[in-house]
Curated annotation (Swiss-Prot):
Summary of subunit composition and partner proteins: Interacts with DNAI2; probably involved in outer arm dynein assembly.
Protein localization: Cytoplasm; Dynein axonemal particle
Function: Cytoplasmic protein involved in the delivery of the dynein machinery to the motile cilium. It is required for the assembly of the axonemal dynein inner and outer arms, two structures attached to the peripheral outer doublet A microtubule of the axoneme, that play a crucial role in cilium motility.
GO biological process: cilium movement; inner dynein arm assembly; outer dynein arm assembly
GO CC entries: cytoplasm; dynein axonemal particle
Protein name: Dynein axonemal assembly factor 5
Protein family membership: Belongs to the DNAAF5 family.
Major site of localization recorded for this protein: cytoplasm
Pfam families xref list: HEAT, HEAT_DAAF5
Biological classification of the source: Eukaryota, Metazoa, Chordata, Craniata, Vertebrata
HEAT repeats: 10-48, 54-92, 94-137, 140-178, 181-219, 221-257, 259-297, 578-617, 675-713, 717-755, 723-761
InterPro entries hit by this protein: ARM-like (IPR011989), ARM-type_fold (IPR016024), DAAF5 (IPR052623), HEAT (IPR000357), HEAT_DAAF5 (IPR056497), HEAT_type_2 (IPR021133)
Keyword set, alphabetical order: Cilium biogenesis/degradation, Cytoplasm, Repeat
Organism: Xenopus laevis (African clawed frog)
C-alpha cells in the first residue's frame, strides 16, 4: 500500500512539473526563470517523502543539468540550488552521479573558464563538497573527473573557489584513501601554484590540503612541496606558519614512508620551535616530543641499552634549557650528517630571513646533537666563521649561541686544534668570535689544561696585531674576558700573556671605544689573582712587559706597534713606572736620539710630557726621578732642542721644551742638580726663543726665568751677557704673552747681577739693555709699559748713573715723559752709587 501511495504521489508531482519542464525549452528567458522557480518550489515541498523526492529528482536531473548551460545566470543559479537541495535530501544521491559528474566536469574542469560567474563556480564546488559528504566512497569511480575539476578550481581566479576546492579535495582524499593515491600527485602542481596566494586564508587552505594529499599519496611528491613549505615558515601570517607546523608534524607522525623523509622534514618542524609566536613554539615542541616518543617506541630494541642505562643530564648542560628526550636526540644523531650540509648552505643564503632561520635551527640541532657533533666540527666551524660576520645582528647572536654549544659538548682538544690552527693561518674576527664563544660554553675543569695553549696563540704578534679594525680588537678582548670568566684564578699562570694581549688592544688606534672595557678586563684579571687592581698587575709583570716591547726598540718608528705598546705601559702603569725607572729610562733615551724618526720622537715626548704633569703619581711616585734628571735633560731633551728644518722638527722642539718646563715645575730637581745641567741647557733653551711656536717661545722664557732663579748669583757675567740680547728681542714679539714673559725673565736677569759683574767692563752691554728697555717704556701697550717700568726700577740698581743718562737722552722722544720722570724720581730717591759705578 505504501508503495502504491508513493507511486501516486510521484505521478502527481511529475504531472504538476510537466508543464514547467516544457517551459525550460522556451526561448524567453523570463519564462525559463519562472519555470525553474516553480520547480524549486515544488521540489522543496516539505510534504514530499524522501522516496518521492528521489524519483522526482531523477526525472528533473537531466533538464536541470541542461540548464547549467543556460545563457541567463539566474537560471543557472536556480538550477544549482535545486540540485543542491535534492542531493542533500534524497536517500540515494549516488544515483545521480552518472549524470551529475560529467556535467560538473564540463562546467568546472575545462582548460578555459566555462562558467563566468564566480559565485556560480563557487556554488558548484560547494555542490561537489556536498556530494563527497553524502556519497563518500561511491565517488571512487569518478576519481579522474574529480581530479580534473580540482586541477582547475584550485587555480581559479576567485579566492573562495580555491578555498572550497581545497576543502573538497581534503575530504575526498579522506573518503577514498585506497584509490586517491593513484592520482594524488596530479594535485601537487596546482596546489603549489596557489600556495603563495596573497590571501592568507587561501594559503592556509592550500597548506592543509597539501598535507592531506601527501598523507594519502605514495609519498613521491614530498620533495616537490618541501621548498614551498619552507618558504611559508617566513610567512607574515601566524595562521600560515601554524598550518605548516601542523602539516609537517602530522607527516612525521603518520606518513607511511616517514623514515626516509626524516632528514628533510625535521628541519622544518624544528624551525617552528624558534618561531616568534609562543603558541607556535609550543605546538612545534609538543609535536616534536610526540615524534621522539613514537620513534623511541618503534625502535625500542635498538635503544635498549640506552634506555636501560640512560646517562643523566650533564652538569655542564646550558642553564635554563630542558634536555630533549632520548628519541628526539637519537633522531638528530642519526640524521645530522644529512641535515648539516643544507643548513650550512642556508646560513650563507643571500636572503636575510633564510639566514636568520637557518642560524636559529643550527643552534637547536647542536643542542640535540650533544657530543655527536664532534665528527662534524670542520663543517660547523667553517659555517660559523662565515655567519659570525653576517650583517644581520640576529644571525650573529644565533651563531655565537651555536659556538657556545660547541664549547659545551665538544672536547676542547678537538675544537681548539681546529680554531687555533685557522687563527694562526688567517687571523680573522670571526675566528676570534667563535673561539671566545666556545670558551664561554666550556667548563672550567675541561679548559684549564689548555689555557697556556690558547693564550700563547692569541698573544702571538701575528694574531693580536692581526687587524686594527674595531671588530677584530673587540673579539680579541672577548677571548680574554671569556678565559677570565670561565677559568677564574687558573688564569694566574697565563696572566702575562693576557696582559700582552690587553696592552696590544690599548695600543691599537681602535682602542678609544674599547678603553673602558679593557680597563674592566684588567680589573677582573687582577681580582681573580687576589691583587688590588691593574697597577698591581703591572707591578707583577713590569720587567717582562718592558723586555717584551723593547726587544726591537732600536728599530722603532712611529708606525711600530711596540712603540705604542710602550706608551700604553708607561701611561697606564701609574705609580709602577716610578718603581722601574731603571728599565724605563734607557729605552726612552735610546728612542729619543736625534737620529731616530721625528714622528716617533714627537709621540714619545708627548707621552713624557703627560707623565711629568703628574710626576708624583707616575715617574716620581718613589721620589727617585731626580737620580735620572741629568739623563733626562742632557741625553733626551737637550739633543732635541737643536734646530732642524721642518714642521715636525719644530713640533719636537716645542714638546721637548714643554717636557723641560714640566720637569722644572715638578720641583723634583734640587738646586744642585739644576746647576749640574745648566751649562749644557741654557744655550739650547735660548735658541728656542726664536721658534715659530708661540707656546714654545713662552715656555722658553719661563724656563730661563726658572733657571735664573735657581742659579741666582752663581752665573758668570759672560753667561749673563749671552742671555739678555735674546730676551730683549722677545719684547718685540708678535704675542703680548711672550713680551710680558720676556720682561719678567729680564727682571730675574737683573737679580742675578752681582759685584762680579764689573759695570765699567760691561758698560756697553748695560747701555744696550737700558736703551732697549726705554724704547718699550713708551710702548703702545699700557700694561707692558708698567711692567717695563718695574723692570727698569729693578735694573736701576745695577748702574743708576748710566740709566739716568740714557733716560735724559730719550725723555723728549717719548709721547709722554711721565714714566721717565717717575723712573728718574725713583732712582734719585732709592738708589745709591754702586761699588763699581759706571764712569
Amino acid at each position: 500500500m505504501a508503495a502504491e501511495g508513493e507511486q501516486r504521489a510521484t505521478s502527481d508531482v511529475t504531472k504538476a512539473l510537466a508543464r514547467h519542464l516544457n517551459c525550460l525549452n522556451d526561448e524567453n528567458k523570463m519564462i525559463r526563470r519562472r519555470a525553474l522557480a516553480a520547480i524549486q518550489k515544488e521540489a522543496a515541498d516539505e510534504k514530499l517523502a524522501s522516496a518521492v523526492l528521489q524519483h522526482v529528482f531523477l526525472e528533473l536531473l537531466k533538464p536541470l543539468l541542461r540548464c547549467l548551460s543556460d545563457p541567463m545566470e539566474k537560471c543557472r543559479e536556480l538550477s544549482i540550488q535545486i540540485i543542491v537541495y535534492c542531493v542533500s535530501h534524497v536517500p540515494r544521491p549516488e544515483e545521480a552521479l552518472p549524470y551529475l559528474m560529467p556535467a560538473l566536469t564540463q562546467r568546472l574542469g575545462q582548460q578555459q573558464l566555462v562558467e563566468l560567474s564566480e559565485e556560480l563556480r563557487l556554488a558548484m564546488v560547494e555542490l561537489l563538497t556536498l556530494l563527497v559528504e553524502v556519497c563518500g566512497k561511491k565517488l571512487a569511480p569518478y576519481l579522474d573527473e574529480m581530479i580534473q575539476i580540482f586541477q582547475r578550481t584550485m587555480v581559479d581566479p576567485f579566492p573562495d573557489v580555491k578555498k572550497e576546492s581545497c576543502k573538497c579535495a581534503s575530504n575526498y582524499a579522506t573518503c577514498i584513501p585506497e584509490h586517491f593515491h593513484m592520482q594524488a600527485e596530479s594535485l601537487i602542481k596546482p596546489l603549489m601554484q596557489t600556495i603563495s596566494h596573497q590571501h592568507s586564508k587561501v594559503r592556509v587552505a592550500v597548506i592543509q590540503t597539501t598535507g592531506t594529499v601527501i598523507q594519502y599519496s605514495s609519498g613521491k611528491s614530498v620533495d616537490d612541496v618541501l621548498s614551498h613549505l619552507a618558504q611559508r615558515l617566513f610567512d607574515d601570517s601566524v595562521q600560515v606558519r601554524q598550518a605548516v607546523t601542523v602539516v609537517v608534524g602530522d607527516w612525521l607522525l603518520k606518513l607511511q614512508d616517514r623514515y626516509s623523509f626524516f632528514h628533510k622534514l625535521i628541519p622544518l618542524l624544528l624551525s617552528s620551535t624558534t618561531d616568534e609566536i609562543p603558541e607556535i613554539r609550543k605546538l612545534a615542541l609538543d609535536y616534536w616530543e610526540k615524534i621522539g616518543s613514537q620513534w623511541e617506541k618503534e625502535n625500542e630494541e635498538d635503544l635498549k641499552d640506552k634506555l636501560d642505562f640512560s646517562a643523566p643530564c650533564p652538569s655542564y648542560y646550558p642553564a635554563g634549557v630542558q634536555r630533549p628526550g632520548l628519541g628526539c636526540r637519537e633522531l638528530i644523531f642519526r640524521n645530522l650528517s644529512k641535515i648539516l650540509p643544507a643548513i650550512s648552505r642556508d646560513v650563507t643564503n643571500w636572503v636575510a630571513g633564510t639566514r636568520i632561520k637557518s642560524s636559529q635551527l643550527l643552534a637547536v640541532l647542536l643542542l640535540h646533537g650533544e657530543d655527536h657533533i664532534t665528527q662534524h666540527m670542520e663543517l660547523l666551524l667553517s659555517t660559523l666563521y662565515h655567519s659570525c660576520l653576517d650583517e644581520e645582528n640576529q644571525v650573529v647572536i644565533n651563531s655565537v649561541k651555536s659556538a657556545e654549544l660547541i664549547g659545551t659538548f665538544v672536547n676542547p682538544e678537538v675544537f681548539l686544534k681546529l680554531i687555533l690552527s685557522a687563527l694562526q693561518k688567517s687571523p680573522l674576527a670571526s675566528h676570534l668570535m667563535t673561539l671566545a664563544a666556545c670558551i664561554r660554553g666550556c667548563s672550567r675543569e675541561m679548559l684549564k689544561t689548555h689555557l697556556t695553549k690558547i693564550t700563547s696563540v692569541i698573544s702571538q704578534s701575528d694574531v693580536c696585531q692581526g687587524s686594527e679594525r674595531v671588530l677584530y680588537q673587540e673579539q680579541l678582548l672577548c677571548c680574554i674576558q671569556s678565559l677570565i670568566d670561565v677559568c677564574q684564578q687558573d688564569c694566574t699562570e697565563v696572566s702575562l700573556q693576557c696582559m700582552n694581549v690587553l696592552i696590544t688592544i690599548l695600543a691599537s688606534p681602535a682602542s678609544e671605544s674599547l678603553h673602558k672595557k679593557v680597563q674592566d678586563t684588567l680589573l677582573s684579571l687582577s681580582e681573580v689573582q687576589g691583587l688590588n687592581g691593574p697597577h698591581d698587575l703591572y707591578r707583577q709583570h713590569m720587567q717582562q712587559l718592558l723586555d717584551w716591547v723593547s726587544q726591537s726598540h732600536n728599530h722603532w718608528t712611529s708606525y711600530s706597534v711596540e712603540q705604542r705598546q710602550f706608551e700604553v705601559i708607561a701611561t697606564e702603569s701609574g705609580p709602577v713606572m716610578g718603581e722601574t725607572l731603571h728599565l724605563f729610562v734607557p729605552i726612552l733615551k735610546m728612542c729619543l736620539q736625534p737620529t731616530r724618526e721625528p714622528q716617533m720622537r714627537l709621540k714619545l715626548f708627548t707621552m713624557l710630557s703627560k707623565l711629568l704633569l703628574k710626576a708624583s703619581e707616575t715617574v716620581n711616585s718613589q721620589g727617585q726621578l731626580h737620580r735620572y734628571s741629568e739623563s733626562f735633560i742632557n741625553d733626551m731633551i737637550v739633543p732635541n732642542l737643536k734646530w732642524q728644518a721642518g714642521r715636525t722638527a719644530g713640533a719636537i722642539r716645542t714638546v721637548a721644551v714643554s717636557c723641560l718646563w714640566v720637569l722644572l715645575q715638578s720641583e723634583t730637581l734640587s738646586q744642585q742638580e739644576i746647576l749640574q745641567v745648566e751649562d749644557n741647557l741654557m744655550p739650547r733653551v735660548i735658541t728656542t726663543l726664536e721658534e715659530d711656536s708661540k707656546m714654545c717661545r713662552l715656555m722658553s722664557c719661563c724656563i730661563i726665568t726658572a733657571l735664573l732663579s735657581t742659579c741666582e748669583r752663581q752665573l758668570r757675567p759672560d753667561k749673563l751677557n749671552k742671555i739678555y740680547p735674546e730676551l730683549l728681542k722677545r719684547l718685540d714679539d708678535a704675542s703680548d704673552e711672550v713680551r710680558v714673559a720676556a720682561a719678567k725673565t729680564l727682571y730675574q736677569w737683573f737679580k742675578c747681577i752681582t759685584d762680579e759683574y764689573e759695570r765699567t767692563t760691561y758698560k756697553g752691554h748695560l747701555e744696550f739693555l737700558y736703551r732697549g728697555l726705554l724704547v718699550h717704556l713708551d710702548d703702545p701697550d699700557a700694561s707692558l709699559q708698567l711692567i717695563v717700568l718695574d723692570l727698569l726700577k729693578e735694573g736701576s740698581a745695577v748702574c743708576p748713573s748710566l740709566l739716568v743718562q740714557e733716560i735724559e737722552a730719550v725723555r723728549h722722544k717719548h709721547r709722554s715723559p711721565a714714566y721717565c720722570d717717575q723712573l728718574l724720581h725713583y732712582i734719585q730717591k732709592y738708589t745709591s752709587p754702586t761699588p763699581t759705578e759706571c764712569t
